[in-house]
Structures are given as structure tokens and as C-alpha cells.
């Protein structure tokens, strides 16, 4: 959880942090390709293991002559001693230690105005240091780092698997009659040529067969699609580059992409592919077929206490998985949680998780808070507030899907543009849990202005639902449930800020946190006809469902009319966006060497 603090400007050793990220990537590759189990080997063991695996390839070392190195002490055959790109250049090995012990192996070029190397690091000016700690520079440096790691490991992996295929083919070929050998060799060579061509082919929109639309947002659309060669079912998000540039959303999209590529949790939606063309960018994510939690909540009204507790448990685990990656969501809503085929939830939509809100957004929220100073909010009972919210949902389908959006679940310090930490996500989850048990959000009003006013005066508005009417007695809260929500919806200094605090609260005393996905059957399990069943999403051929997106389409039309009057995004605006998820492709039998080509391995982050 401490990694959440990384969202602030970096004050420590940036080179060491980037080297740590490279180390994770390095270990992931080795484990994925079956070369070693990262946790069980030391760095020296890893180096020896790699040498054993790749020595038989008889690779010629690149730039191996001594004159290519500033000092003879730098020459090393170990892969883990290769220099890693970093905004603060250092000779770091995989463990983060200095690989080159000679403190004077770099020439002093300070007289020319260029940076000077000393004690293994570069002395930078104040202006250069300011650039180094910028989030954009950090990201670009990491992209460069990952690119070279991906490139060379994929090259080594290709050579290794090609040799394995050739060996298996030769073994099987000896068992075949002479009359068939020429034909089999020809087929083998043909497969290898196809394999090489496939490695050079860029992924494109045409590689996917769209099935039906399942979502629509202010900046793009989401489609259920099938990848033509692998038959993978994905949710393909398509966003226009010019629109993103005009609305200053490029950083948010890149943040979402970075989170998805980093995430390796059962609680977070997985990214399978990310690619782009001249007009659009594409995110192909795993398809979660059960719809979003908003739909489930709207159809259910009020959840029973043990059902609400189950979903709250999974939501806290999901947001903790995001926090452990070093990100804050800040804008959690029921729509951000999707229900999987098994009934368990996954967190998605990380576009605003960068930890940086644009000045325009902050200013607009401050203005909204000021505008509601004179708004007269009528006193309403809990029963009236629940009825108002349910009426709005039934009569105005746009209400819960507004592009502008009301701040029902957003912490006050975020709205005011003040400093905040990851506890703002616990505020949001407290609001969602309140809605699960009450049937309406704690600060909802009959209109958006009333909601803003309620949030500004949240201490007065936040009340425990209590019902005396016999028809509503079942909606009364348990004391431990109310106490828990009060620890989420409160001032930052008193608010829960860690999963450990949540787990230790009496309300969750009987929850088996380590085995939630196996120990409990979800209250709702989607009834699916096939892997491409999109029945739990809006039908975009239905006029009633499309009415929810009237405001979305109006905003898109307004943006489209404005886009041409502004400069287009720079060509490098989306650099480092491309991604393919990893899949093993080791040969398993000698017969496969003759009968079928191996599927091409997928690539990691590519420029």
C-alpha cells in the first residue's frame, strides 16, 4: 500500500525505481518461458541459468570488442549486467546495485556543457532534474526500458524455440521414408516463413471480427469482438485520437493502458491487446459478460445484508489490488465493477487513476460547489429520498449514465482540489455500500444541483436510514454495518485507509478474505447461453436502451464540430501504446513439429 505514494513527484532514486520495474519484467519473462522460478534463485543463479539455456545457440555477442566500452572493467557477458535505460543513467545490474565499480570510467565532459559522470551517476543541472522527475519523462523512460527488454528477450526466445522446433523436426524426419522427406522439409520451411512474417505483422482493427456493441462513452465505443486467428473473445474499446486530444484525455487513456498492462490480478480486468492506427486507439480487454454492478443494483433495489457484505468484500479486494500497483482510482462508481461469468466482480475503467486531475477539471468542480451555495435543499425523510432516487431511475434512464455525472461517490477533498490519498477510494466504496443497503446513494438529490449541495454539506446530509413503517422495517441497518460505513464516509484523518483496517472491523469478522472466490457462492451468477452472450449489456438496436445515450451522442457531436479547429495530436502522443499479452508456445511433442506449426508467441510492450 505504500506504493500509492509513488503518484507524487519522485523524490528518491528514480534510476533504482525503474531498475526495479525492469527486474520485475525480467523475472516475468524467465518464469513465463520456463527458464527459472524467480523467487527461488539468486541473481548469480539466474545468470548461470540463462547462460546454460542460450550458450548452445552460439550467438555472437553484440559490440563485444573492448574498444566499444569506456573501460575494460565494464565488459561482462552476463545478461543481467547490461545497462538499463534510465532518466538518471546508472550502471545498474538487475538487483539495483552498481555493476561497474570503477568510479572514473566515464570521461569528464563538463567543460563542453554536457552532463558529467561521477561515481556511477550523472550530475544533472536543476533544469535537467526538473525534467527527469516529470511523470511524462518517467513514463517515456520506462517505455524505452521495457521496449529493449521485450525486443531482446523475444529475439532470444525466438531463437530458442526455433532450435527446439528444428530438433524435433529432424528427429521425426529420420523416422519417415525417403520419399516423403523432401515434401516434409518444404512444408517445414514454409511454416517457418509464415512464422517469421507473423512476427513482423502489426496487429490491426481488421484482425478482429466485431459481433455487437456493448458500450458507449463520451470518447468512444466498446464492442464485443473475436480475434480472427486466436478466436479470443474480447471487449474492444475504440477511441478517436483527435477527440482525446481535444478533451485533454490522452494522459488518462495512457494511464489506463499502463495499469492494464501492469495488472496481474483476478480482481482487475486484463488487457489482451493495445494498438493504434492513424485515427483511433484500441484496447482489447477480456470480456466480462455479466454486465456492470449498476445494472445489478438497479434491478435489485436493496440488497440483503449478507449479499451487500459479499460484494463489499470483493470491491475492497479489487481496489486494494489497484492500490498495490501504486494507483488511486478517485472516481469509483457501481458502473466500474463488472460481474464475471462466475458471479465474482472485476474492477475496470482506470482512465482517471493517474493521481493527477487537470486544472480545468479541478476548477470546474470548485465552481460547481460555489454555485450551490444558495441552493435551497428541502428536508426529506429517508423513505422520501429512496423514493425520489428510484423514481429518477425509472423515469429518467439518462440519470445514472450521465456524461457530466453527479459526484454521488466522490470524496469532498477531490471535489475541492485539495491533497488526498488512496482513502478517497474508501469513501467511494462506503457510498456504494450505503446504496446497496439503502437503495439510494447517501448524497443523491432530485437533481444534480441538489446532489452537489448535499455533498458540500455532507456532515448534515449523511444520516442513518431508519424506518418505523412496518413495510420498511427490513431496510433498517445492523449496528456494525452502520459503524463500518461511518469509518468510510468521514473526514480523511478518521477514515479507513488500508485493507487491514477493513478486514479487522467486526462487520467482516466471519469473512474468509484469503479464499473469497472459492469459499462463497456469489448471490448472482449470470445465465449465459454462450461465450458471446451480451444479454446483460444494453441493446444498441433498441430505442429504449439508446435513450440512455442521448447525452453521450450530443456531446460527441459537439466535440466533432470543434476538433478540426484545433491542432491534431503529435505523432508521438501515443508512443508506447502497443501491447500484446504473453502466451507460451513451447513445443510439446515431436509429432507437432511435423503436423502443425506452433502458434506465434505474443509480444509485450512495443513502440
Swiss-Prot record:
SUPFAM superfamilies referenced in this protein's UniProt entry, alphabetically: Protein kinase-like (PK-like)
Comp. bias intervals (Polar residues): 109-118
InterPro entries attached to this UniProt entry: AGC-kinase_C, Kinase-like_dom_sf, Pkinase_C, Prot_kinase_dom, Protein_kinase_ATP_BS, Ser/Thr_kinase_AS, Ser_Thr_kinase_AGC
Gene3D superfamilies: Phosphorylase Kinase, domain 1, Transferase(Phosphotransferase) domain 1
Alphabetically ordered keywords of this record: ATP-binding, Cell cycle, Cell division, Cytoplasm, Cytoskeleton, Kinase, Mitosis, Nucleotide-binding, Phosphoprotein, Septation, Serine/threonine-protein kinase, Transferase
GO molecular function: ATP binding; protein serine kinase activity; protein serine/threonine kinase activity
Active site: 331
Binding residues for ATP: 214-222, 237
Gene Ontology, cellular component aspect: cell division site; cytoplasm; mitotic actomyosin contractile ring; mitotic actomyosin contractile ring, intermediate layer; mitotic spindle pole body; Sid2-Mob1 complex; spindle pole body
Residue ranges, compositional bias (Basic and acidic residues): 93-108
AGC-kinase C-terminal domain segment(s): 509-589
Domain Protein kinase: 208-508
Catalyzed chemical reaction(s): L-seryl-[protein] + ATP = O-phospho-L-seryl-[protein] + ADP + H(+); L-threonyl-[protein] + ATP = O-phospho-L-threonyl-[protein] + ADP + H(+)
Compositionally biased region (Low complexity): 589-607
Residues with PTM Phosphotyrosine: 219
EC number(s) on file: 2.7.11.1
Cellular compartments annotated: Cytoplasm, Cytoskeleton, Microtubule organizing center, Spindle pole body; Cytoplasm
Modified residues (Phosphoserine): 56, 60, 65, 86, 402
Major subcellular site: cytoplasm
Region (Disordered): 93-118, 586-607
Short name of one Pfam family: Pkinase
Complex formation: Interacts with mob1 and cdc11.
Family under the similarity heading: Belongs to the protein kinase superfamily. Ser/Thr protein kinase family.
Role summary: Part of a signaling pathway. Required for initiation of medial ring constriction and septation.
Protein name, UniProt field: Serine/threonine-protein kinase sid2
Gene source species: Schizosaccharomyces pombe (strain 972 / ATCC 24843)
Amino acid at each position: 500500500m505504500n506504493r500509492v505514494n509513488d503518484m507524487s513527484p519522485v523524490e528518491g532514486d528514480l534510476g533504482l525505481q525503474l531498475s526495479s520495474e525492469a527486474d520485475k519484467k525480467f523475472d516475468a519473462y524467465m518464469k513465463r518461458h520456463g527458464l527459472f522460478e524467480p523467487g527461488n534463485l539468486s541473481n548469480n543463479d539466474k545468470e548461470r541459468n540463462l547462460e546454460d539455456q542460450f550458450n548452445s545457440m552460439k550467438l555472437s555477442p553484440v559490440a563485444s570488442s573492448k574498444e566499444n566500452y569506456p573501460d575494460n572493467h565494464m565488459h561482462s557477458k552476463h545478461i543481467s549486467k547490461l545497462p538499463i535505460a534510465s532518466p538518471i543513467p546508472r550502471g545498474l545490474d538487475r538487483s539495483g546495485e552498481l555493476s561497474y565499480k570503477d568510479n572514473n570510467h566515464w570521461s569528464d565532459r563538463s567543460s563542453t556543457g554536457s552532463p558529467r559522470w561521477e561515481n556511477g551517476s550523472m550530475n544533472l543541472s536543476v533544469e535537467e532534474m526538473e525534467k527527469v522527475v516529470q511523470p511524462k519523462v518517467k513514463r517515456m523512460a520506462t517505455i524505452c526500458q521495457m521496449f529493449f527488454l521485450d525486443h531482446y528477450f523475444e529475439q532470444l526466445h525466438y531463437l530458442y524455440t526455433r532450435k527446439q522446433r528444428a530438433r524435433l523436426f529432424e528427429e521425426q524426419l529420420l523416422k519417415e521414408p525417403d520419399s516423403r522427406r523432401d515434401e516434409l522439409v518444404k512444408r517445414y520451411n514454409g511454416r517457418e516463413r509464415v512464422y517469421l512474417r507473423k512476427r513482423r505483422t502489426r496487429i490491426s482493427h481488421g484482425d478482429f471480427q466485431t459481433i455487437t456493441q456493448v458500450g458507449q462513452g463520451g470518447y468512444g465505443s466498446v464492442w464485443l469482438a473475436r480475434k480472427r486467428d486466436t478466436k479470443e473473445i474480447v471487449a474492444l474499446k475504440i477511441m478517436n485520437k483527435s477527440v482525446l486530444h481535444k478533451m485533454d484525455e490522452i494522459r488518462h487513456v495512457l494511464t489506463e493502458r499502463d495499469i492494464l498492462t501492469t495488472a496481474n490480478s483476478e480482481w482487475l480486468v486484463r488487457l489482451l491487446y493495445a494498438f493504434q492506427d492513424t485515427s483511433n486507439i484500441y484496447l482489447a480487454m477480456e470480456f466480462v459478460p455479466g454486465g456492470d454492478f449498476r445494472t445489478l443494483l438497479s434491478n435489485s433495489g436493496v440488497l440483503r445484508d449478507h449479499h451487500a457484505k459479499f460484494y463489499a468484500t470483493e470491491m475492497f479486494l479489487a481496489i486494494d489490488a489497484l492500490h498495490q500497483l501504486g494507483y488511486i482510482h478517485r472516481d469509483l462508481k457501481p458502473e466500474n465493477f463488472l460481474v464475471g461469468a462466475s458471479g465474482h466482480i472485476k474492477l475496470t475503467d482506470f482512465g482517471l487513476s493517474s493521481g493527477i486531475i487537470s486544472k480545468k477539471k479541478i476548477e470546474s468542480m470548485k465552481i460547481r460547489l460555489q454555485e450551490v451555495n444558495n441552493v435551497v435543499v428541502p428536508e426529506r425523510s429517508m423513505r422520501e429520498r429512496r423514493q425520489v432516487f428510484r423514481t429518477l431511475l425509472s423515469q429518467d434512464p439518462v440519470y445514472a449514465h450521465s456524461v457530466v455525472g453527479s459526484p454521488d461517490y466522490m470524496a469532498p477533498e477531490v471535489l475541492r482540489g485539495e491533497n488526498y490519498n488512496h482513502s478517497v477510494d474508501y469513501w467511494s466504496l462506503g457510498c456504494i455500500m450505503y446504496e446497496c443497503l439503502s437503495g439510494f446513494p447517501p448524497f443523491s438529490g432530485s437533481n444534480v444541483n441538489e446532489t452537489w449541495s448535499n455533498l458540500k454539506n455532507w456532515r448534515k446530509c449523511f444520516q442513518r436510514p431508519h424506518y418505523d413503517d412496518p413495510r420498511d422495517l427490513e431496510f433498517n441497518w445492523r449496528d456494525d454495518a452502520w459503524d463500518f460505513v461511518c469509518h468510510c464516509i468521514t473526514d480523511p484523518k478518521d477514515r479507513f485507509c488500508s485493507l487491514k483496517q477493513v478486514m479487522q472491523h467486526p462487520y467482516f469478522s466471519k469473512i474468509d478474505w484469503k479464499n473469497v472466490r472459492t469459499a462463497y457462492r456469489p448471490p448472482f451468477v449470470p445465465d449465459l447461453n454462450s461465450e458471446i452472450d451480451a444479454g446483460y449489456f444494453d441493446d444498441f438496436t433498441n430505442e429504449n436502451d439508446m435513450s440512455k445515450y442521448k447525452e453521450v451522442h450530443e456531446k460527441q457531436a459537439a466535440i466533432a464540430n470543434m476538433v478540426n479547429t484545433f491542432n491534431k495530436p503529435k505523432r508521438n502522443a501515443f508512443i508506447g501504446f502497443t501491447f500484446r499479452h504473453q502466451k507460451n508456445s513451447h513445443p510439446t511433442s515431436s509429432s507437432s513439429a511435423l503436423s502443425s506449426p506452433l502458434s506465434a508467441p505474443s509480444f509485450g510492450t512495443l513502440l
